C-alpha cells in the first residue's frame, strides 16, 4: 500500500459481495486441491476502500488454500458483534502454532518448517489494510477444532 492509501476516500462496501467475489476468484485454485470454499451470505457493510479490503480477504483466503490439506474446507463469514463487524476466514488445515501467532504479521517472517512458497509479506500487508480501516486481526482456532480462523474486527458502518 502506498503512503497515500490512508487518505483515499472510503465508500460503503458490501461484505457479502466481497466474500462472494473472493470465493468465485479463488475456487479454481482451491479446486486443484479439492478444497471447498463457502461464502456465507451477508448484508453487512463497512466503510472502506473496496480494492484494499478485497486484497485483504483474498490474501487471507489464498493463505488458507496454501496451508489446507487436500480435500479440506474454507469458510468465509461475517457477523455483527455489538459495535463491531467481524469478518472471518476459517480453515481446517494444520493451524498456526501458538508460538508463531504473535510473529506472523511481521514483515518477512516465515515459521520454521514452512514448506509453502511465499515472501513473508502477505500478512504484514493484511495487517496494514486492517489498521487503515481501524480494524484489528485476531488469530483463533479454526474449523473442526483445528486449523486457523483469521478474524478481522471493523467498526460498524453507521
What residue ranges belong to the model's regions?
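Short conserved segment of the HATPase_c
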Residues: 96-108
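Short beta-strand/loop element within the Bergerat-fold HATPase_c
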Residues: 71-83
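Short alpha-helical Gxxx[C/S/T] motif in the catalytic ATP-binding
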Residues: 122, 126
Amino acid at each position: 500500500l502506498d503512503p497515500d492509501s490512508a487518505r483515499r476516500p472510503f465508500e460503503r462496501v458490501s461484505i457479502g459481495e466481497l466474500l462472494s467475489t473472493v470465493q468465485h476468484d479463488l475456487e479454481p485454485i482451491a479446486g486443484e486441491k479439492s478444497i471447498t470454499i463457502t461464502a456465507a451470505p451477508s448484508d453487512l457493510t463497512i466503510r472502506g476502500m473496496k480494492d484494499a479490503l478485497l486484497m485483504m480477504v483474498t490474501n487471507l483466503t489464498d493463505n488458507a488454500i496454501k496451508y489446507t490439506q487436500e480435500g479440506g474446507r474454507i469458510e468465509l463469514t461475517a457477523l455483527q458483534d455489538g459495535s463491531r463487524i467481524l469478518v472471518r476466514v476459517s480453515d481446517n488445515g494444520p493451524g498456526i502454532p501458538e508460538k508463531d501467532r504473535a510473529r506472523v504479521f511481521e514483515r518477512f517472517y516465515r515459521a520454521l518448517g514452512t514448506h509453502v512458497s511465499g515472501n513473508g509479506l502477505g500478512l504484514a500487508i493484511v495487517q496494514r489494510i486492517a489498521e487503515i480501516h481501524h480494524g484489528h486481526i485476531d488469530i483463533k482456532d479454526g474449523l473442526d477444532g483445528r486449523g486457523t480462523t483469521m478474524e478481522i474486527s471493523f467498526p460498524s458502518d453507521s
